[in-house]
Amino acid sequence: MSEQQGFTVWFTGLSGAGKSTIAEMLYHEFQSRGLKTEILDGDEVRKNLSKGLGFSKEDRDTNILRIGFVANLLTRNGVVTICCPISPYKETRDACRELIGEFVEVYVHATVDEIAAHRDPKGLYKKALAGEITGFTGVDDPYEAPEHAEITVDTLSQTPEESLQHVLTRLKELGRVDDDTVHVTGERVHSGLTDLRVSEAGTVVKEH
């Protein structure tokens, strides 16, 4: 049996877009296929490796670079590593890409208006849009969308299963997975985009 080749799948997108949902589904899909895989969630890294960091650009960059550092260690040791922080700044994402090398960027597209209308149960986007919360990514703090991501999914027009299938299909086209990893069955899809929560955009609420 050939040795597993590590690579990183890096999800980026606004809070509430669907990153954590699709990343977790992908993680379980890979596990079910016997791949060595780990998932690095932006909130969990903040809690365990980045305590004390705020939401200034410098602090956000530090958190993302720490995720990139850990992802690089895992990747070079043959682990398929899934990262799903907001990672709003292109320069920092590019730094992680350069560090890791074996890097696939997945842009999870959803607009602020769409998220505020459909996936904002605590009303955080509405408060940010009203000026009641400041430093909120996508509202008064920038989110620099990728222009050349290897994979793009639109979670407003796709079901979770469709988004996952598209990611797997593109990973096969990119030579990252084989045919045995591509087909998704309903039994392994365990969460939906209706469970999304606004997270890590200035006010931290766990995104399931």
Please provide the spans of the model-predicted regions.
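Conserved substrate/cofactor phosphate-moiety recognition/catalytic segment
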Residues: 23-69, 76
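ATP-dependent NMP and nucleoside kinases share a basic, alpha-helical "lid"
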Residues: 48, 52-54, 71-129, 135
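The conserved Walker
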Residues: 15
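Conserved lysine of the Walker
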Residues: 19
